[in-house]
A protein has these predicted regions:
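A solvent-exposed interaction/effector surface
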Residues: 34-188
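Glycine-biased, low-complexity coil/linker segments
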Residues: 3-5
């Protein structure tokens, strides 16, 4: 029997499908629904990013090939001051103002306490609060994670939302292939 409300194949002037048609159709539909759900990048407006005791280190262009080393140095710096990292790594990208904006990249980590004596290159805020952000939640292969930022840029364009150019990417969880990432983009 066909599904309720379905049109018989013969009504379209073609031969009826094999006996298993409704079952195969349902399987394909369910698989497609799962693929769609797993590949969805959720977007929301007017979200607030709040980080406490956040330690930041600016990354120079010459250091981009050594990001793993920089993260290890940050963790060692935190531990050497009797503090502990709290939560995931955050990457912040800001653009300089002027006729030729240049990206500035920062690695950030929240720590369990303020560090009293900072070495050159490090900055710390007791509370970093960024209100009114566009937000995207990405789950999937990390080599596609840039799609979250791209989707927010498209969303901002379609909804006439002005962005400042500052974005925070929070690497919530990740293994060798897949991961979870939250992206906050600052709005004007």
């Amino acid at each position: 029997p066909l599904l309720v409300g379905a049109v018989a194949a013969g009504d379209w002037g073609v031969e009826p499908f094999p006996h298993s048609f409704p079952y195969n159709c349902l399987l394909q539909t369910k698989k497609k629904q799962v693929d769609i759900i797993m590949r969805e990048i959720q977007v929301a407006e007017n979200k607030t990013l709040k980080l406490t005791n956040v330690l930041a280190r600016k990354i120079d262009a010459s250091e981009l090939g050594n990001l793993g080393v920089i993260l290890t140095q940050m963790q060692n710096f935190i531990k050497s001051h009797s503090a502990m990292p709290v939560g995931p790594v955050i990457q912040c990208v800001k653009f300089t103002s002027g006729p030729n904006p240049e990206p500035q990249i920062y690695f950030m980590m929240q720590v369990n306490q303020l560090i009293p004596r900072l070495e050159p290159g490090y900055e710390q805020d007791a509370v970093l609060r960024v209100k009114g952000c566009l937000y995207a939640h990405f789950t999937g292969p990390m080599d596609h994670s840039s799609l979250a930022s791209q989707k927010l840029n498209i969303y901002a364009y379609e909804h006439e939302i002005e962005l400042t150019g500052t974005a925070y990417s929070i690497y919530v969880n990740q293994d060798s292939e897949n991961g979870v990432m939250d992206v906050f983009m600052e709005t004007k």
